[in-house]
Amino acid sequence: MITIIDYGLGNLGSIKNMLVRSGIKCTVSGDPDVIRGASRLILPGVGHFKFAMDTLHERGLVTVIQQRVREANIPLLGICLGGQLIGRHSEEGDVAGLGLVPMDVVAFDRARLTQCEKVPHMGWTVTPHADIPLFASVQQPARYYYVHSFHFRCDDPAAEIAWAEHGYRFASGVRHGNVIGVQFHPEKSHVYGQQLLRNFAAMEFGA
């Protein structure tokens, strides 16, 4: 059973509906006990990084998520802001994240953008690396919906599983062990998002 973590931010209904349409059993909960019993987790998110982390702390979810991922090796998929929260730190609010992936979240460097390249970045393009299970059987060219002003910056290039370009190349998907983060919204990306979520539900992560 996949548990979508409810902390008051994110497209919970859209994600749940996409999972249900894909034949995947899921539940939505912000109850720490339910999260402890989940076999897989999805961390959604839309909004401000600092507010999101403050909310997770207030609801007693930070330690629960960290323990399930680090100690029980439960797979987690972070989506959009949720994908950013799995990192160590964000320039948005200058605050620490969950620290599950060795990466930081940085603002787009406007000095490297042309007048036509606006912030927030809105688009549909993503280029997966070869042989990435999360993108198995996804029709190419893949189209995933973005709207964001900050992006991932990975320490280890091997953690990057997909990339996009907006003035310059940036990581749009990352994986570190049993933790995956995507900057885009699979729940808003039609058949491409459906296949990605099916893949996450079926992937073998190992111990």
For the regions a protein language model found, what residue spans apply to each?
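Acyltransferase
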Residues: V182-A207
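An anion/phosphate-binding loop that grips the pyrophosphate of nucleotide cofactors and donors
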Residues: A38
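Cysteine-nucleophile active-site neighborhood
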Residues: G47-M122
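N-terminal beta1-alpha1 ligand-phosphate binding loop
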Residues: I2-I24, E187
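Short, surface-exposed beta-strand/loop micro-motifs that present aromatic residues
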Residues: Y168-R175
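Beta-strand-turn-beta hairpins that frame and shape the catalytic cleft
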Residues: P141, R175-I180
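Pocket-forming structural segment of enzyme catalytic cores
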Residues: R88-H166
